[in-house]
From Swiss-Prot:
<dbReference type="GO" id="GO:0009060">
    <property type="term" value="P:aerobic respiration"/>
</dbReference>
<dbReference type="InterPro" id="IPR004033">
    <property type="entry name" value="UbiE/COQ5_MeTrFase"/>
</dbReference>
<feature type="binding site">
    <location>
        <begin position="116"/>
        <end position="117"/>
    </location>
    <ligand>
        <name>S-adenosyl-L-methionine</name>
    </ligand>
</feature>
<dbReference type="GO" id="GO:0009234">
    <property type="term" value="P:menaquinone biosynthetic process"/>
</dbReference>
<keyword id="KW-0489">Methyltransferase</keyword>
<dbReference type="Pfam" id="PF01209">
    <property type="entry name" value="Ubie_methyltran"/>
</dbReference>
<feature type="binding site">
    <location>
        <position position="69"/>
    </location>
    <ligand>
        <name>S-adenosyl-L-methionine</name>
    </ligand>
</feature>
<dbReference type="InterPro" id="IPR023576">
    <property type="entry name" value="UbiE/COQ5_MeTrFase_CS"/>
</dbReference>
<comment type="pathway">
    <text>Quinol/quinone metabolism; menaquinone biosynthesis; menaquinol from 1,4-dihydroxy-2-naphthoate: step 2/2.</text>
</comment>
<keyword id="KW-0831">Ubiquinone biosynthesis</keyword>
<keyword id="KW-0949">S-adenosyl-L-methionine</keyword>
<comment type="function">
    <text>Methyltransferase required for the conversion of demethylmenaquinol (DMKH2) to menaquinol (MKH2) and the conversion of 2-polyprenyl-6-methoxy-1,4-benzoquinol (DDMQH2) to 2-polyprenyl-3-methyl-6-methoxy-1,4-benzoquinol (DMQH2).</text>
</comment>
<comment type="pathway">
    <text>Cofactor biosynthesis; ubiquinone biosynthesis.</text>
</comment>
<dbReference type="GO" id="GO:0008425">
    <property type="term" value="F:2-methoxy-6-polyprenyl-1,4-benzoquinol methyltransferase activity"/>
</dbReference>
<dbReference type="InterPro" id="IPR029063">
    <property type="entry name" value="SAM-dependent_MTases_sf"/>
</dbReference>
<feature type="binding site">
    <location>
        <position position="90"/>
    </location>
    <ligand>
        <name>S-adenosyl-L-methionine</name>
    </ligand>
</feature>
<dbReference type="GO" id="GO:0043770">
    <property type="term" value="F:demethylmenaquinone methyltransferase activity"/>
</dbReference>
Length: 243
């Protein structure tokens, strides 16, 4: 059986999904806190940039994968309006429930669906925009997930991947110190869960860098793939178009 990475640990492919699920079941109730700790609060600016680049308009159909607590979903639903169709999806039931409840609390009524990005339950050429924010690095078969995202995107539509990436060299030493020393300590202090936060830091280091992910998206059949480095490469937003 093939091996894959769970953070820095080498595990069987069929074990990774279970281990990742355990992490997100554990952090679901504190997910927004987790994002604040991992990004020093910058995730709001990164998501705002992604929302602006998505340029969702009234009537659009949008698929938000690994949507978590629904930050992107909320903005997309408002932009698409009553004639649009925006799906809030996640493979993790705990995350999906937290996100669905949060959306309802904010007056956003939009469908939520338990969804594996490697087997997206929608027809070909269905969505105008497909997004995944901070979720791709946790997927076992990233190439399969990207191919599925392209499949369900309409011709002329876009796939957008917002993810932690490779930081610029002058920032690397400070970033490593924060990721491997400060972040687990914060996770233990504020969420009583140092191990989950340690995995999340490790998963970022194992994720493909900017150019590698660009190539993967091209190999999945997307065209005109480009990326924006945000905060010195801490995060990158990749965009690809389906022609």
């Amino acid at each position: 059986m093939s091996k894959t990475h769970f953070g820095f640990e080498s595990v069987e492919e069929n074990e990774k999904a279970k281990k990742v699920a355990g992490v997100f079941h554990s952090v679901a109730s504190n997910y927004d806190l987790m994002n604040d700790l991992m990004s020093a609060g910058m995730h709001r600016a990164w998501k705002a940039f992604t929302i602006a680049q998505a340029n969702v308009r009234p009537g659009f159909k949008v698929l938000d994968i690994a949507a978590g607590t629904g930050d992107l979903t909320k903005s997309f639903a408002k932009a698409a309006g009553p004639t649009g169709e925006v799906w809030h999806t996640d493979i993790n039931e705990s995350m999906l429930r937290v996100g669905r409840d949060r959306l309802l609390d904010k007056g956003v009524v939009t469908p939520s669906l338990l969804c594996d990005a490697e087997k997206i339950p929608f027809p070909d050429n269905y969505f105008d925009v497909v997004t995944v924010a901070f979720g791709l690095r946790n997927m076992t078969h990233k190439d399969a997930a990207l191919a599925e995202m392209r499949r369900v995107t309409k011709p002329g539509g876009r796939v957008m991947v917002l993810e932690f990436s490779k930081v610029w060299d002058p920032l690397k030493k400070a970033y490593d110190l924060y990721s491997f020393k400060v972040l687990p300590w914060l996770g233990d202090k504020f969420a009583k869960d140092a191990e989950s936060y340690r995995y999340l830091a490790e998963s970022i280091r194992m994720h493909p860098d900017q150019d590698t992910l660009k190539t993967m998206m091209e190999q999945a059949g997307l065209d005109a793939v480009k990326y924006y480095n945000l905060s010195g490469g801490v995060v990158a937003l990749h965009l690809g178009t389906k022609y």
